[in-house]
Amino acid sequence: MQESSEQDRETEKMDLKEIMAQRVFAVAGDTLNEEKYAYKIKQGLLAQGYTVYCVGKELKSFNDIPGDIDIIDMCIHPAKGLALIKECSKDFKCIVIQPGAESGELLEYLDERGLPYLQGCVLVGLSVYGRGRS
């Protein structure tokens, strides 16, 4: 991340409605296992016409994603998620931290760098604010 981008983000906060208005999502987690929430989130986003990239089982890093990322959705063990964020050199608008993907260390890292995040659920966002909803 570039320093100026980090500073610009310090004042930016997004709510779930704004997050669901974005187009490009990077889902971090096991998106290949039908039993996992990352898979369900991936399928839900794709079904509603979002562009989705999957990091963890499909791509190894957010840096492997071609083009821009709007939203990073963390649906992965907190230690793995923190490692992915630490190595990320791409700009993004917000990180959604799914229930169970949070840790004190992750939140502290994001806060210290002024990286925008929301603790919430993209599946809820899809049902309430997804494309085709008003």
Model-derived features with residue positions:
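Hydrophobic, well-ordered beta-alpha structural blocks that scaffold small-molecule cofactor pockets
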Residues: M1-N63
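Generic structural signal for hydrophobic
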Residues: L45, E87-C88, L110
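A short helix->loop->beta-strand "cap" motif at the edges of active sites that frequently abuts
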Residues: Y50, K90-I95, R113-L115
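Active-site regions of enzymes building and remodeling cell-envelope glycoconjugates
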Residues: E58-I72, G114-Y117
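Mid-chain, well-packed structural core segment of small domains
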Residues: I65-G104
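Rossmann-fold NAD(P)-binding glycine/threonine-rich loop
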Residues: P99-L126
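A charged, well-structured terminal subsegment
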Residues: V128-S134
